[in-house]
Amino acid sequence: MQKQDPSFGKGCYVDSTPLPNDIDNNPFNALCCHGVSSSEIMTRLVLVLDEKSGLPVWYDIIPGNVLDINTVMTIVNDVAGTLGIEIDSLVLDAGYVSKELIGAFHIGTEKTIIGRMPARKGYPYKTLYWEVKDLIGKGKYAFVRKHHAYFGIKKKITLFENPIYAYIYVDQYNALKRFSDYLVEHEDEFDELKVRDKDWYTVKYGYFVLVSNIDATPKELLSEYFCRTEIEVVFKTAKEYLDLLPLSKWTDATVRGKILHDIIDTTAVLLLRKSMRQSGLSTSEIIGRCQSLMCCRKKDGTITVETPSKQVKEYYGLLGLSVPAHVKEDTCKKEIGLKM
């Protein structure tokens, strides 16, 4: 990919998702805590996506539910050491934003980040709302993205003794819709609230804050952040392939091999979907039509390929491919990088 685009992998989205953990002796499972009242055995798949193409650059399997600066820097260093790709920008979810992360990535540091501010103690999440409350609804701060009207404003703040930009947003469509739903179900509860709290509830369900060391407009930064939704598509695709191995197969080597196989499958499906986007055809339909060509190998290594139907030829044509009548085994292995 870097031969085609030298910038591939330099700007990345990083996120993680829980893997199936129903098997007790999964070697990567670890006990992790969720708040004060629950704990769970968990393994997480960490994915790094190229921000331009949306394709996986790197993945790792981590025990438990560790989402911190060490995880991020380990990923950055592994990608640099193994692939020679220096990641220079990161888009992270709230689980990664911490005091240590802000200390490593703030205004003036070389690498850039965008992260979602957690709504928990130690972060000025609601404080920022009260600071800009009277500006919400003003046309000066309004913009539209994908049919949703947003309020957005940027403030330079100090977070954990480091300078950072806070981008404060209200998705006014979501805020109004979900506030209306809340009122229908909790009208009596709402009536009991203080006036100040009632004001907060009118925006609560559309309010969020992004932190970044990038100096941009609120609209520009939000577009950059929302591109990370690509990673959710990849996770959804990946989970369609990440089926559980048989109980007897759960070893370090087999789990790593299974995940590698599934990431390759995921990448292939994503590339196929990207190529098919304008065709109006589903990926499953094309795979179903094209996967059943029979092949016969002769003693001299020549592989004869079944003659495809007219419709199958058309499907291959959508990918810019033609079906050869014959293939040399040695040539084919070299083309796909297999050792002879």
Please provide the spans of the model-predicted regions:
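Anion-binding and metal-coordination hotspots
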Residues: 1-340
